[in-house]
Structure formats: structure tokens, C-alpha cells
Amino acid sequence: LIKAKQSPERITSRKIFAQIVKIGFPSALETALYNIAMTFIVRFMNQMDVDGMNVTARSYAIQIANFSYCVGAALAQANAIMTGWRIGAKEFEECNRGTRKAAIYGIITATCFSVTFAFAGHFIVHIFTDDTQMINLVVKLLIVDVFLEFGRVTNLVYGQALKTSGDAFFPVILGAIFMYLFAVGGTYFLGIHMGLLAVGSYIAMAGDECARAVGMVLRWKSGKWKSKGLVEV
């Protein structure tokens, strides 16, 4: 799909290694921050009840919603590969078109999946449990998940494109602010303080994903990534 010059020197080039670290380190840091945030969220959800119903409902909802996540992750990774090459070739308009198209396809597909799961939730959750109270709770989470997936797939596509372009620290900074302000703080406020429990936590996480998605799109549209390219072809 991509034609590029072969350069044996790149295999042992310290410059190339430094460029890899420049992208890889912020990405690893963002993942670490995300995992720590999820640890806080699970901690708060464990405080919502004594029988672990809210944490269990979250686990069921995540298993079902993972199908939507896979779509967004696949499109984000594929677009990131093409974006890296196009930036190296200075084909910035193609980067814009490709990233926008990947985001649109991802949003449509992920939304279709998540809406289907929300409508068919009562039937799907029966795979895991026959507890009516649990089923009703998971279905509520799947309804909120429609908005969560909308934000997440946008966040994934534009976030990966920014990282590939060399603008790797912006997603980390944005993620650190919104993950802990919206997802973690929102889980405590809505879930525990307001008494919305797992539904409140999901609303907070949906707010986090959508807020970060807006930030990623605005950063991409600013065009600052055009001056941060690391690869030449």
C-alpha cells in the first residue's frame, strides 16, 4: 500500500530510535495514567455497595461494549499508519481527509454497535446472569455507553493521528486533566455524592471521552501537528 525508500541505516540509527522514544514514552505515560484513573474508579465503585453489584455490572457492560471499542481501535491504528507516511511525504491535505474519514466511519460503526447493544441489552446480558436487577443496571450502562463510544472513537482516531504526527505530549496532558477531573472526580461526585452509583460513573466517563474528543479535534484542526513530523519518505 505504501511505497517508501529502503534505508539500511535506519535500522541502527540513534536518531530514529530517539524519534520512536519521543512518541512511545508519552503514549506509555498516557496508558499508565489511564490505568491509575481506572483503579480509582473501581475503588470508588466498590464503595457504592457491599455486594459488588456496581463493579460487576461495569464488567458486564465493558465485555459487551468491547466490540464497539475494537472498531475504533482498528480504524485509529490503520489511520495512524497512513498518517505517519503522509506527514513524511508532506501530504497534509491527505492526512486531513483520511483522518476525518476514519473518524466518521468509526463514529457511525461504533454508534450502530452501541445502539444495538443498548436495545438488545436485556437479551445479551442474560448470557452472564438471570438477575433482573443486574440486567436492568447493565442495560442503563449500555444506554450511557452510546455517548461514551461516540466520544471514545473520535478520541482514538484523532489522538493516534496526533501521536503519529509527533504531537505526542498533547494527548497526555489533555488526558491527565480530563481523566482525573471528569472520569475520576465525576465518578465520586455523581456516583457516590449524588447517589447515581454505576450509572453516575458511566456518565462521568462518557463526559471524559467526549471532552477529550473535542480537545483532540480542535488540536488537529489547529494544524500545529504539521510542524512536528518525524518521518521523511
What residue ranges belong to the model's regions?
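Small-residue-rich hydrophobic transmembrane alpha-helices
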Residues: 42, 55-121, 152-175
